């Protein structure tokens, strides 16, 4: 499970998830990526579940990069407790994902295997996803 080693504050505000992702919109390490189309919190358990689904389908071949990390603690009050009397205790960790963010990347496998592995991973996540291919950059120059 992914979780921070230590944090400055145990509890955080919920925040908002308006707008698109600021960075991490391109496939930078692998050949194929899984891109979020909607905004959501993704828990450390969901990230781990998606990772296991991908690696099992690839039969330990290729390489997987996880590009999101659950830095944000979320809290929950116990069941049947009245409102008030402070914020609840930390329940788990989430990664805030906005539209356009590349969450996972894959390299070292064929296109069919990569597409199917990312499709299986997308079913484990609470966001709509799109499978994207790496864009080659810096090929030609305009000088003559």
From Swiss-Prot:
<dbReference type="InterPro" id="IPR016180">
    <property type="entry name" value="Ribosomal_uL16_dom"/>
</dbReference>
<dbReference type="GO" id="GO:0022625">
    <property type="term" value="C:cytosolic large ribosomal subunit"/>
</dbReference>
<protein>
    <recommendedName>
        <fullName>Large ribosomal subunit protein uL16</fullName>
    </recommendedName>
</protein>
<dbReference type="InterPro" id="IPR036920">
    <property type="entry name" value="Ribosomal_uL16_sf"/>
</dbReference>
<dbReference type="GO" id="GO:0000049">
    <property type="term" value="F:tRNA binding"/>
</dbReference>
<keyword id="KW-0689">Ribosomal protein</keyword>
<dbReference type="InterPro" id="IPR000114">
    <property type="entry name" value="Ribosomal_uL16_bact-type"/>
</dbReference>
<dbReference type="GO" id="GO:0019843">
    <property type="term" value="F:rRNA binding"/>
</dbReference>
<comment type="function">
    <text>Binds 23S rRNA and is also seen to make contacts with the A and possibly P site tRNAs.</text>
</comment>
<comment type="similarity">
    <text>Belongs to the universal ribosomal protein uL16 family.</text>
</comment>
<keyword id="KW-0694">RNA-binding</keyword>
<keyword id="KW-0820">tRNA-binding</keyword>
<dbReference type="GO" id="GO:0003735">
    <property type="term" value="F:structural constituent of ribosome"/>
</dbReference>
<dbReference type="GO" id="GO:0006412">
    <property type="term" value="P:translation"/>
</dbReference>
<keyword id="KW-0687">Ribonucleoprotein</keyword>
<comment type="subunit">
    <text>Part of the 50S ribosomal subunit.</text>
</comment>
<dbReference type="InterPro" id="IPR047873">
    <property type="entry name" value="Ribosomal_uL16"/>
</dbReference>
<dbReference type="InterPro" id="IPR020798">
    <property type="entry name" value="Ribosomal_uL16_CS"/>
</dbReference>
<keyword id="KW-0699">rRNA-binding</keyword>
<dbReference type="Pfam" id="PF00252">
    <property type="entry name" value="Ribosomal_L16"/>
</dbReference>
């Amino acid at each position: 499970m992914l979780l921070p080693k230590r944090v400055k504050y145990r509890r955080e505000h919920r925040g908002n998830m308006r707008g698109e992702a600021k960075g991490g919109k391109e496939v930078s390490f692998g050949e194929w990526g899984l891109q979020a189309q909607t905004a959501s919190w993704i828990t450390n358990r969901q990230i781990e579940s998606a990772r296991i689904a991908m690696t099992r389908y690839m039969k330990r071949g290729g390489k997987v990069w996880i590009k999101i990390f659950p830095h944000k603690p979320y809290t929950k009050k116990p069941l049947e407790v009245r409102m008030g009397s402070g914020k609840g205790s930390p329940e788990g960790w989430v990664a805030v994902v906005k539209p356009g963010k590349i969450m996972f990347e894959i390299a070292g496998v064929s296109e069919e295997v990569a597409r199917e592995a990312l499709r299986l991973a997308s079913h484990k996540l609470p966001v709509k996803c799109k499978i994207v291919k790496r864009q080659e950059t810096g090929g030609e120059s305009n000088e003559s």
